[in-house]
């Protein structure tokens, strides 16, 4: 929005041309989203407390979690609001990818909001029934997949890029739609499963989102893309502003969500942020790198799949409790130790993801 205004004002003073620089707008984006989260955060917490929108805690989980009962939840709405405002202010609203990611985030946020509302306000422990949640996730995921497929202008935009190998791009054809669907919906649910401890999901989301912003910047610059042997996707660089806003909003939320948390993001936040990460990874053609950098999300998801499969087949559980962060808690790890160690793992995996740019 402001980019269009400054473009007009630059006719009268050259100072305003500075806002054409993507890097500056990304910095302003992260600062704006951070400021909104920090300034509005306390007010949101007070409002949620007044409305008695508090977290319900499982009685069969770690006993240390019982004290979390009643902690305000649905704070993901604050993250979405901060990202949206910052992106609309500093992003190029003529860019299709900005709108795709924004709309996917908002759509999945609505699904999460309905689920949270039914659980917390209507006191329905099931929330939104799983089949309906998956149905709407599928609708929105497929809508994004079809749009990206039919608006792709080059074959590289729908090919699977294999990291660590030079010039290995697998043409996907219509299978691109299937892959995109699973990446978006899968990442959305993976972040949701990870969001079980104070700050556990939000910092890895910030780290992976920030890294994807760097990939978006490189993919959107034809010189960098050519040098690094990654596909050039015209316009994808503008997603750096969105990723910067995500990082700022996430860090601002972490201020209140760090142990002991004053607020939880709820499904409205985790489903939306996960879907946004998946969509960005698809646009910049780094689905496999997302799998690496988001290793914590993958680990949490796989632990649930293995636990359910093992119990159905053998009536025995592999882990004391799934997702796996609860397993470590029940083994005696203090909650902050689990959280920080998972953060450290994510930092290492993000660095591995960056290394794939040069190791080929």
Curated annotation (Swiss-Prot):
Q: Does the keyword Transmembrane helix apply?
A: yes
Swiss-Prot/TrEMBL cofactor(s): Mg(2+)
The record lists the organism as: Marinomonas sp. (strain MWYL1)
Keywords for the protein's UniProt record, in alphabetical order: Cell cycle, Cell division, Cell inner membrane, Cell membrane, Cell shape, Cell wall biogenesis/degradation, Magnesium, Membrane, Metal-binding, Peptidoglycan synthesis, Transferase, Transmembrane, Transmembrane helix
Instruction: Write down the PANTHER family for this protein, in alphabetical order.
Output: PHOSPHO-N-ACETYLMURAMOYL-PENTAPEPTIDE-TRANSFERASE, PHOSPHO-N-ACETYLMURAMOYL-PENTAPEPTIDE-TRANSFERASE HOMOLOG
Top-level lineage group: Bacteria
Q: In which pathway does it act?
A: Cell wall biogenesis; peptidoglycan biosynthesis
User: What functional role does this protein have?
Assistant: Catalyzes the initial step of the lipid cycle reactions in the biosynthesis of the cell wall peptidoglycan: transfers peptidoglycan precursor phospho-MurNAc-pentapeptide from UDP-MurNAc-pentapeptide onto the lipid carrier undecaprenyl phosphate, yielding undecaprenyl-pyrophosphoryl-MurNAc-pentapeptide, known as lipid I.
Answer yes or no on keyword Metal-binding.
yes
| HAMAP family the record matches | MraY
Similarity field: Belongs to the glycosyltransferase 4 family. MraY subfamily.
Q: How does it sit in the membrane?
A: Multi-pass membrane protein
GO process annotations (BP): cell division; cell wall organization; peptidoglycan biosynthetic process; regulation of cell shape
Name this polypeptide is given: Phospho-N-acetylmuramoyl-pentapeptide-transferase
**Record field: catalytic activity:** UDP-N-acetyl-alpha-D-muramoyl-L-alanyl-gamma-D-glutamyl-meso-2,6-diaminopimeloyl-D-alanyl-D-alanine + di-trans,octa-cis-undecaprenyl phosphate = di-trans,octa-cis-undecaprenyl diphospho-N-acetyl-alpha-D-muramoyl-L-alanyl-D-glutamyl-meso-2,6-diaminopimeloyl-D-alanyl-D-alanine + UMP
């Amino acid at each position: 929005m402001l980019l269009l205004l400054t473009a007009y004002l630059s006719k009268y003073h050259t100072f305003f041309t500075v806002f054409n620089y993507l890097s500056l707008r990304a910095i302003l984006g992260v600062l704006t989203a951070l400021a909104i989260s920090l300034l509005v955060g306390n007010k949101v917490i007070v409002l949620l407390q007044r409305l008695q929108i508090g977290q319900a805690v499982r009685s069969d989980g770690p006993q240390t979690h019982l004290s979390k009962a009643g902690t305000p939840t649905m704070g993901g709405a604050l993250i979405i609001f901060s990202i949206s405002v910052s992106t609309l202010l500093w992003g190029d609203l003529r860019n299709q990818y900005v709108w795709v990611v924004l709309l996917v985030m908002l759509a999945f946020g609505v699904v999460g909001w309905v689920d949270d509302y039914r659980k917390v306000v209507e006191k329905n422990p099931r929330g939104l029934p799983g089949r309906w949640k998956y149905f709407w996730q599928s609708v929105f995921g497929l809508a994004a997949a079809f749009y990206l497929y039919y608006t792709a202008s080059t074959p590289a935009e729908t090919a699977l890029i294999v990291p660590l190998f030079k010039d290995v791009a697998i043409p996907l054809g219509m299978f691109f739609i299937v892959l995109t669907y699973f990446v978006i919906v899968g990442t959305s649910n993976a972040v949701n499963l990870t969001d079980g401890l104070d700050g556990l999901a939000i910092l890895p989301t910030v780290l992976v989102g920030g890294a994807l912003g760097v990939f978006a910047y490189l993919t959107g610059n034809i010189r960098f893309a050519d040098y690094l042997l990654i596909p050039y996707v015209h316009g994808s660089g503008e997603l750096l502003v969105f990723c910067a806003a995500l990082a700022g909003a996430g860090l601002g939320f972490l201020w209140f969500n760090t142990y002991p948390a004053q607020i939880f993001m709820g499904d409205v936040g985790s489903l939306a942020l996960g879907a946004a990460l998946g969509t960005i990874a698809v646009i910049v053609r780094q689905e496999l790198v997302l799998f690496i950098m988001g290793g914590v999300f993958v680990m949490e998801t796989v632990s649930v799949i293995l636990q359910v499969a093992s119990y159905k087949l053998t009536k025995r559980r592999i882990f004391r409790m799934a997702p796996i962060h609860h397993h470590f808690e029940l083994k005696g790890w203090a909650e902050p130790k689990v959280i920080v160690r998972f953060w450290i793992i994510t930092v290492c995996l993000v660095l591995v993801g960056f290394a794939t740019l040069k190791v080929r």
